[in-house]
Amino acid sequence: MSNLKMKEAALIYLDRSGGLQKFIDDCKYYNDSKQSYAVYRFKILINPSDVVELDAELGNHILHQPLKAAEVFQSVCFIAVKTLSLIGQLQTETQINIVLKLTHLPPLPSYGLDLCEFPLDYTSQRFYMMQGIVIAMTTITKYTQGARFLCSDEACPLSKGFQYIRVHVPGATESATIRNDFLCNLCASSLQEDRKFRVLGDKQIVEIIATKALRAFQGYSNNQPFRFQSLTIFLRDESVNKMNIGNEYKIIGIPTCVKTSQTAVCIEANSITFCNSKVPSGISDNFRCLLSLTSSSCWKFTAILANIFASQITPPGTYNLLKLCLLMSLVQTTDRNKELEDCLDILIITSDTLLIDRLLNFSINLVPRGIRHLVSTEIFPTLSRNKYGTGAVSIQAGSALLAKGGICFIGDLASHKKDKLEQLQTVLESRSITVYIPGKKFGEDIDQQMTFPVQCSFWSFVDVDSSSRRNAQKINTLIGQMDCSLIPANLVEAFGLLINCNESSPCHPFLPTVQHTLNKAINPEGLFYAASRQFTTEDFEKLLAFAKNLNVEFSLEAERMTHGYYLASRRIRTGSVCGSKLSASALKYLVFLSEAHARLNLRNKVLKEDVLIAALLFETSLTLKYGATVFCVAPNAVFPFELYNEEYLEQRDLYLTQCQQQLEQFIATYGPGTTIFSSDE
C-alpha cells in the first residue's frame, strides 16, 4: 500500500473515532492562545483493533513501527490544519508533535513482556504490555519536550523560520533532543537553540517488579527457580503521578536501552491501567457443605475454620484463638484500588517463637499481598539518588507499602531498633508515613515532603523468654495484666489486638504440638489429619478471596451493641489522673472486628453475634494490656472447650449465649442512654 493510502485510512479512522473533532478543538485552543509556539502537541487515542479492521497495514505500522505511524498521522494533521486554516501561526509539518496513545494490545504472547523470563525481547522498538507492582518512584523533574534550532550563519535562509524542530520520541534521551553539535543541512554551519521556544514537560521514573516476584518477599519457597529483576518505567506528561507505590498496573510501552554505569532496559510508558484482581465466584464444595451444616449457628462455622486452619503447621485444636484472629485479619485485606482503613493489627506474646513464626508465615501466603519483612531491609520508605542522573530523588517502597491491601509480618519486635519502633507506633496511630526530602542533600533549592497512606495490617510477636532475660519481671498489681516491659507501652496500645500464646495460656497445648513436630520431622510432606486432606490450602485461599470482597453492613441491633459496649468500656476504664485508657480508634477497631467475623461467616450483614465475638476478643486484649474490670472475660472465652465434635460446639454456643447476656447486662448498667433489644422485643 502506498503512503497516500495509509494517510487516507488514518483520516477515516480519526473521523470515525471522534479524534478529528478533538484535534480541531485542540487546534482552536492553540489558535486562540496569545502565546507563540514552536511545537504543537496533539494526543490521539488509538484503538488497535478498530484500526486493523479498517486498514491492516496502518494497524501493523501502529503496533510494530509506532514512530513511522506517528509520521503518517503527523502528515494528515498538518494537511488538515492547512486545509481548514486551524492554526494561523503554523509554518512547517515538523512543528506538529503527534503522540499516539493505545487503548490496548492484542492478547497474544508476542505482545507480552514477562519480567520473570529471560531473555527479554527489547531490540525491536515496538509496543509491549507488561504487568507489575511499583516498588520505587522518583520525584517529578522536567525534560525537553520540544525545541527550535536555527542556523548560526545569518546569511543562511534557515537562520529563520521553523525548519529545525526537534521533539522527544519514545526511548530517546535528553541529549537526543538538546545538543550543541547539530549541523545545518544547507550550509553545514552549527545550529543554535532558540531557548525562548523550548517546551518542557514533566517526567517521573518508577520501578516495577513482576507480581510473581512477590514470592521473594513472602518467606516461602517451593523450590521453583524464578528470575527477580525490577524494570524501570519512564512516565511523561499526562502519565506522571498516575502510578502509586504498592499498586499493580498493566503498562503498554516501548522498550529502550539506557546506558548508565551499565546498560539497562527501560520502558517508555504509553498507557497505564490499574489492575483489579478477579473476584472468585464462590467457595469450594467442602466449605459450602460445612457452611450449610452449621447454618443454624452464627458461631460454629468460624469456630471450625479456626480449629482446622493451618493444620500443616500446628495440629487442629491448638492456637484456636490466634488462628481465628489471623483469619479475621486476612479477611479484612483487599485487592481493590481503595483506601484500606479496616486493618487488624496483631501483636502476639509467646514463648514458642519458632512455631508462631511458621504459623504467621504460612498465613501471609494465603493472600496476594502477604509480605514477610526481613530485618536487613526497611519497613518504611527510604531515599536514594536516582541512578539515571536526572537529579530526582528515588523513594524506595519498603515492606509496608509493598504490602498494600495485605499483611506486613515484621517478625519479632525485639529485633527492631528503638527509632524504628517509634516510627512503627506513629504509623499504627496515623496510618500514614511522611518522607522528608532534604533539598540540600539532593541538589534541590527547597526541602520537600511526601506522605504515603499505609494500607496494610501489621503482625508481630514478642518473645516472653527474651523479655524476662533482659528485664526483671515487674510485679503486676492488676489481675490478668501481661508483662510487656520489653516494648514501649504506647506501641503495645497502638496494636489493636494483643494475644497471649505462652505456655501458661489455654491456647498452648503442649503434647499435641510436640507430636506434630516429630511427625513433620519424619515426613515433612505428610498430611496427618483428616482436616488437612478435606480442606486444602487452596480451599482456604479461595474462601478468603471470596469473603474479603463481600460488602457488609451493620444491623441496627449490632450497631447499638457496638456503641453500647464502647461507651461502657470507656466509662469503667477512665481514671481521674490519666483519663480513658481506650483510644479514639477503639470504636473503629470494634467495627472492623465485627465486620471481619461477619465476612468470615460469608454474611453481608453484621449481627449482634458478630459483635459479641469482637467484644470478647477486644476485652481479652484490653485485659492483657491494663488488667481486668467489671466485665471480666476469661482468657479462653472465645474457645472455652476443645472442639472435638458436635457436642462441644453446642456447649460453646450455650456458653457464648450466656456471654452475650452478660454483655447486654454490662451495657445496660454502664452504658447510659444505650438501648439493647432482646430477641422478643
Curated annotation (Swiss-Prot):
The keyword DNA repair applies. One of its GO terms (biological process) is synaptonemal complex assembly. Plays an important role in meiotic recombination and associated DNA double-strand break repair. Residues 533-621 form the MCM domain. The keyword Aminoacyl-tRNA synthetase does not apply. GO terms for molecular function: ATP binding; DNA binding. Pfam families: MCM_lid (PF17855). The modification Phosphoserine is found at S292. It comes from Homo sapiens (Human). One of its GO terms (cellular component) is nucleus. This is Minichromosome maintenance domain-containing protein 2. It comes from the Eukaryota. Gene3D superfamilies: P-loop containing nucleotide triphosphate hydrolases. Keywords: DNA damage, DNA repair, Meiosis, Phosphoprotein. InterPro entries: MCM (IPR031327), MCM_lid (IPR041562), P-loop_NTPase (IPR027417).
